[in-house]
Amino acid sequence: MTCLFGMLLSTGALLKVLDPGPLTQDASSSLFAIGDQTIDRVFETNVPLRAEHWKSIYIHQSLTSGGDAMSLGRGGAGLADHFVIGNGSGCADGEIQIGRRWSQQLPSGLPDAARSDSISICLVGDFNHNHPTATQEARLAQLVTALQHQFRISSEHVLLVTRRNAGVLGAGTNFPVAELRAQLIP
């Protein structure tokens, strides 16, 4: 009995030491990565999908060499985007991370997003100096076409700005706009 009590006490103390503490606003439990076969998981949100609300998709770069949704979400308001697609530095190449704003069906927190009814996708990277990875490009096309299909968003409402202008972050001058547009649903 004493041995069992000692083991339970030790286990409890170890768990207390290893406890990371409560999740912050940016570290929502709804932040998870999805793989190729599970793209439909983006439609499994904590609240009902607001299908009538989402009218466009806004794609931009992080202007960082690496990172993930947690690092991009540091600051007062947390992650401003609905989705983050990794470049292999900070998270897996092509990994799609889903943020709290999407799982709660909230508007993007980006000041430069075109409209409040835009779904915001951030690709990790600085595409004014580098190019997205082939895996990022493939996963972006997969995500965008799934969103287009689900919410009936035409390709003309997939918004990309290739250069910074009037405070708009954009997708970067090296972003392959024509290649992405060729894969979109008209």
Question: How does the language model describe each region?
Answer:
Residues 75-77, 114, 152:
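Glycine-centered secondary-structure boundary/capping sites
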Residues 38-104:
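Short, conserved "active-site rim" segments that organize catalytic pockets and cofactor/ligand binding
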Residues 98-116, 120:
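Short, surface-exposed glycine/acidic/tryptophan-bearing loops
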Residues 67-68, 72, 102, 115, ...:
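A sequence-level detector of short, solvent-exposed, charge-rich linear segments
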Residues 1-53, 96, 117, 123-186:
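Basic/polar, cationic surfaces and motifs that engage anionic cell-wall
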